[in-house]
Amino acid sequence: MAAGPRTSVLLAFALLCLPWTQEVGAFPAMPLSSLFANAVLRAQHLHQLAADTYKEFERAYIPEGQRYSIQNTQAAFCFSETIPAPTGKDEAQQRSDVELLRFSLLLIQSWLGPVQFLSRVFTNSLVFGTSDRVYEKLKDLEEGIQALMRELEDGSPRAGQILKQTYDKFDTNMRSDDALLKNYGLLSCFKKDLHKAETYLRVMKCRRFVESSCAF
């Protein structure tokens, strides 16, 4: 392996292992650039995990001929679409960093309850063997976003919008067609919401710290 790629991989792993700053005034304080880099890496990892889980579930349980029609039904509707959040990179660039952080936090927090049931639903024969750690990873990203909010809001983040609705828990009755459709829809929303959160964080990081990876 060339020195350049190997160094990048080691750096990424090191950033994933870094703890977040617990207090704004803590010493030594983590630079803002590192906070953003840490958050982006965690969001990318979660988004990829969600995408892999969705694909594996689809391959295992959803007949190929039914996938398109199911994706266009109410089961595929994500309630997060009712939040006035940007739907893509271009819209995200029109919002302030604080707004994007609040939207990211809302998206992450809306899944903290439902994902606790993932490990009860999926078997270890699938990719879901890591599902019992998804909650921990989401909590870690939530903490990172809150650390960024403290930095950008001078240590006193204002109360954000409170979600009046959250996602249902995953259905453990995998022999039911209704349960399969429900879980399929939830996994689709989970993937979409994590993609949004990742996009928001990458937009913020790129416009604050111009770099070659800004093209996405």
Curated annotation (Swiss-Prot):
It is found in: Secreted. InterPro entries: 4_helix_cytokine-like_core, Somatotropin, Somatotropin/Prolactin, Somatotropin_CS. Zn(2+) binds at residues 45, 198. Disulfide bonds join 78-189, 206-214. The keyword Metal-binding applies. One of its GO terms (cellular component) is extracellular space. It holds the Pfam family Hormone_1. SUPFAM superfamilies: 4-helical cytokines. One of its GO terms (biological process) is positive regulation of growth. Keywords: Disulfide bond, Hormone, Metal-binding, Phosphoprotein, Secreted, Signal, Zinc. GO terms for molecular function: growth factor activity; growth hormone receptor binding; hormone activity; metal ion binding. The keyword Protein transport does not apply. Residues 1-26 form the signal peptide. The modification Phosphoserine is found at residue 131. Plays an important role in growth control. Its major role in stimulating body growth is to stimulate the liver and other tissues to secrete IGF1. It stimulates both the differentiation and proliferation of myoblasts. It also stimulates amino acid uptake and protein synthesis in muscle and other tissues. Belongs to the somatotropin/prolactin family. This is Somatotropin. It comes from Hippopotamus amphibius. The gene is GH1.
